[in-house]
Amino acid sequence: MKNNVKNLIEFIDHSPSCFHVIENARKQFLEHGFMELKEKEYWDLEEGKSYFVTRNGSSIIAFHLPKKDFQGFHIVASHSDSPTYRIKEQPEMSVEKHYTKLNIERYGGMIPETWFDRPLSVAGRIIIEENGQIKDQLVNVDRDLMIIPNLAIHMSRSSNESKQLNPQKDLLPLCGGNLTKDGFEEMIAKESGVEKEDILSYDLFLYNRMRGTTLGINEEFVAAPKLDDLECAYSSIEGMLNAKLSKDYVTVCAVFDNEEVGSGTKQGAGSTFFPEVLKRISYLCGKNEEEYYMAVADSFMLSADNAHAVHPNYQDKTDPTNRPYINEGIVLKYNASQKYTTDANSAALVKYLCKKEKIKCQVFFNRSDMLGGSTLGNILTGQVSIKAADIGLPQLSMHSTYETAGCKDLDDMITLMESFYELGKEVQI
């Protein structure tokens, strides 16, 4: 198993919730000398230093300041969340005094059938009271805890036909026998090393316990949960940590929460988090408002979110002339309805970098008779008017609880990120 793929699998394995994604990113940045900033405190920025700031524990913006008289910003944006199920308050539901299942609700647009008949567990954060203080604490029940059992075909002869699943009835996970009321919270408290009475609230989500792996005759594929979009988040972090960062531009690695539900939260791409950080950097470097706008005009962003590869069993679902394949390079994403930010100018820079690094570049369009998904690029450029391109890695089974992508593509994406972060003012965008 190649190093990048091995490290990606480790990153995903240790990131069972969006909060864990950001905590793992935070640890990596700290290990590489980045300094943590707090939004509610004064910032003191020095030339040649690197920093990061988090919001809600589920979004992070890291940046390197080469000099105070910088040209603009070079940004890579991705997201920390994936489709899953959120556990409701008072979740225990007794079934005929013999089973206990949990009350959950959908988060994002998942493929529900992929959650059946596999070991699941729960992770996220709890909010506790400790010595008169309110604190948050990450929790991961690191064992096979529950399952969503299918109905046997003998009891549903039409189960292989199209079926509409009811998330309030058909998708509730079995977590035990006849548990006492509050048994779930008692278990969470025990796993977290706190008293149940100290838990004030929680944000807890289901996750697939299947570990990532490589497969294929030549181990050319990587399969894992949450490849959308942790593959791009991981690549952007690695690219920033590995690159000889630009001496002209502030390089920015941003990972936002809540992309899968529209980004309209205080920590999402549609919030003030992104423009506020860029403005604080600019103003603390002595730029006035006009100079901030000048810096924005000389900036560029890569919105990094995975793309649909041609499916081997459903080839007709892809555009007839623009057909991305796994392990055939970075994907540039276009959409006439402007769900993606790519235009001729921004695509040219991506193609230039791919040519420079000898990386293949592919193109994605939706079929003209099919609606596609959206991502965070156009939401961010609606907040700050930055030239941008939407890119991603080709993958299969997007929004399944277990997805498939290419090993070579991961290497190429990290190389592209490094090259982008190293760009100086010699290349006019």
Question: How would you name each of these model-derived features?
Answer:
Residues 1-429:
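N-terminal hydrophobic/helix-forming segments and targeting peptides
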